[in-house]
Amino acid sequence: FECYERHFGHRPEHVCQNIVTAKENIPPHDLLVGGFPCQDYSIAKKGARGIEGKKGVLWWEINAILRAHKPRYVLLENVDRLIKSPAWQKGRDFSIILRCFYEAGYAVEWRVINAADYGEAQRRRRTFLFAFRNDTALFRKAAELICVEGLKGAHQLLLQDGFFAPIFPLYGFERKYSEGWLDEFRYLDLKDLSAAQSCHFYASGLMVNGRFYSVESIPLQFPYKPLCSVLETAPLAERYFLSAADIDHWRYLKGAKQETRHRRNGSTYFFSEGSMAFPDRSDLPARTMLTSEGSVSRSTHVVADPQTQRLRTLTPIECERLNGFPDDWTAGMPERLRYFTMGNALVVPLVKAMGKRISALAEDEQRS
């Protein structure tokens, strides 16, 4: 929060409080933007419980704000597994979210976007949801197209006339798709839906008037930025470099494993995982950064320093660059938190493009 205020200043409306108690103080607004915690949907966490998890339930606080204020537009973000959660009833959680939007009077378009596909230096896949109220011009256009053209109209929206296509163009679609209804004629209420609904959602999709259509999309790929494009070239502190004594441990962390391990209660289990590149290839975009970046862990990037060729971890500045932030955006906080912050962050150019798109929609709305 201090980092935010350092860049944007202090204002009375900047409230860093528990959303459960602070939501009553939220003023009227036209755009609701948020990202509810991802741990209960993430593949990085074992036993993730989805919308029922301790953090996944924060969706219901967003839903309460949605119903209380009825903003014209809503932009939300989460991990790519959101559309598949939970593992034992795939698509249930996302169906619940879509049904909530339907009941509140919104249509929704979603897209799973890999930042590297659109010219960024990180292979960071995230699910973005854009919801628009049923009295907006975009809603009327979507409803008319789907009513008249059916699935052909849905294709047109996803490929050309919807929210995401103008800023993140698609090459086309694969043959994988799903469609169905989430309205009260199919499921009496959320309890009924939660008990019975299971669906395979894909990377692109729409929900209008309770009907959803989802298809596996093929992005129109832009030239990507390789990891080497963000690496610092100035001499770096020794703490970033791997010592000779640590190399074997890093090789073990990154290597393939098939071994017997012991639980805390003394029982054993067989553990298996594949190998990772060591060091990371600098001619490709970086892997997805996690909040543990910079620590001694399997997921931490290790690169050959461009000046010395010695193996090292990424610096906080390099992590900022991977997300499109200016250098030293997080300066002033402990280094551990700088890595943690970037592991939680979005890729800025993607969000900036969405912001401009929303602004254009709002201007069109005023003219219509």
Regions found by a protein language model. Name each.
Residues 4-5:
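Conserved SAM-binding loop
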Residues 10-17:
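Conserved SAM-binding strand-loop segment of SAM-dependent methyltransferases
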Residues 17, 33-34, 76, 291:
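Redox-cofactor binding/interface segments in oxidoreductases and associated redox assembly factors
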Residues 22-29, 39-276:
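Class I S-adenosyl-L-methionine
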Residues 37-41, 71, 294-295, 327-328:
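Short connector loops/turns at beta-strand edges and beta->alpha or beta->beta junctions
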Residues 200-368:
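C-terminal target-recognition/interaction regions appended to catalytic cores
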